Amino acid sequence: MATKPFFRRRKVCPFSGDNAPKIDYKDVRLLQRYISERGKIVPARITAVSAKKQRELAQAIKRARFLALLPYAVK
């Protein structure tokens, strides 16, 4: 008897939609959700962010790091 194939449900981008938050480099609380404990940017396949929004998110995180709002690395 063949087993039924397992289909993983596609996650929805948290930045697409009507009342989705805007990506802003000054919004440190929002950006910290997309940074690992070590300070690295979490990949889109884990956070389910679309490719376009992942680029915006990475740019905002890098900008916030440059302005010392976020750390480059956590020891």
Curated annotation (Swiss-Prot):
Please name the source species. Answer: Rhodobacter capsulatus (strain ATCC BAA-309 / NBRC 16581 / SB1003)
- Classification via InterPro entries: Ribosomal_bS18 (IPR001648), Ribosomal_bS18_CS (IPR018275), Ribosomal_bS18_sf (IPR036870)
Q: Which gene encodes it?
A: rbsR
From what superkingdom does this record's organism come?
A: Bacteria
Q: Which Gene3D superfamilies match?
A: Ribosomal protein S18 (4.10.640.10)
The name on file for this protein is: Small ribosomal subunit protein bS18
What lineage, starting at the top, does this entry show? Bacteria, Pseudomonadati, Pseudomonadota, Alphaproteobacteria, Rhodobacterales
Q: Hey, which family's this protein in?
A: Belongs to the bacterial ribosomal protein bS18 family.
Keywords from UniProt, A to Z, are: Ribonucleoprotein, Ribosomal protein, RNA-binding, rRNA-binding
State a GO cellular component annotated for this protein: cytosolic small ribosomal subunit
One Pfam entry for this protein is Ribosomal_S18
